[in-house]
């Protein structure tokens, strides 16, 4: 191998190594959600998708997503909640883009394997701007059918975040999975998770 070929080979390897971070970079969305953003646009935002935040507050059946996908957030959410809801989703985007783990399972993988309904019980984490303060656990309503983590939960989380709180929004088991006081069990387990990971959550 002559000197010129060796140099070309070394340069090729260096170029490939330089491209590796870009190749493995996580796609990030923009915090540009407004009341006029459609539900499809919101759900396809790479950071909303990547965060795992649950945004299906009205759909009890998968086919209902087709009806709502081209509706705006203003049409989807209650008028008095929509502005704060949009800001909450922008917070989710910002947190995800900053490397924050937004979605936390409150049960272990072993527990979920034994009872798959436990996989739907989650916490959505909004860290405070200043760590070490108080936290609030938001339990959004309408547990008879579907829960409202984005609309009621998100809007409350945004207001509390603006007051300096670290906020957790609980997605608890509902409808057919809500028997035997399941939502109360989820609430207790959520508090346990927060308490056991207080240093990690900075609360």
PLM regions with names:
Residues 142, 171-175:
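Short beta-to-alpha linker loops that shape the active-site pocket of alpha/beta-hydrolase fold enzymes
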Residues 2-9, 21-117:
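N-terminal targeting or regulatory segments adjacent to alpha/beta-hydrolase or S9 domains
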Residues 178-200:
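Alpha/beta-hydrolase active-site loop
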Residues 11, 15-19:
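Hydrophobic core
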């Amino acid at each position: 191998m002559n000197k010129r070929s060796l140099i070309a080979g070394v340069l090729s390897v260096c170029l490939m190594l330089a491209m590796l971070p870009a190749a493995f970079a996580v796609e990030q969305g923009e915090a540009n959600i407004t009341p006029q953003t459609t539900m499809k646009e919101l759900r396809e935002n790479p950071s909303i998708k990547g965060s795992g935040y649950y945004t299906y507050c009205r759909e009890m059946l998968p086919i209902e997503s087709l009806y709502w996908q081209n509706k705006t957030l203003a049409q989807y959410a209650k008028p008095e909640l929509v502005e704060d809801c949009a800001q909450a989703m922008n917070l989710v985007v910002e947190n995800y883009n900053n490397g924050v783990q937004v979605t936390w399972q409150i049960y272990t993988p072993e527990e979920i394997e034994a009872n798959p309904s436990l996989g739907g019980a989650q916490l959505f984490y909004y860290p405070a701007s200043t760590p070490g303060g108080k936290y609030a656990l938001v339990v959004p309503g309408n547990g008879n059918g579907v829960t409202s983590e984005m609309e009621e939960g998100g809007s409350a989380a945004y207001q509390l975040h603006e007051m300096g709180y670290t906020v957790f929004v609980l997605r608890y088991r509902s409808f057919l999975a809500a028997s035997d006081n399941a939502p109360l069990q989820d609430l207790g387990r959520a508090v346990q998770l927060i308490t056991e990971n207080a240093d990690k959550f900075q609360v």
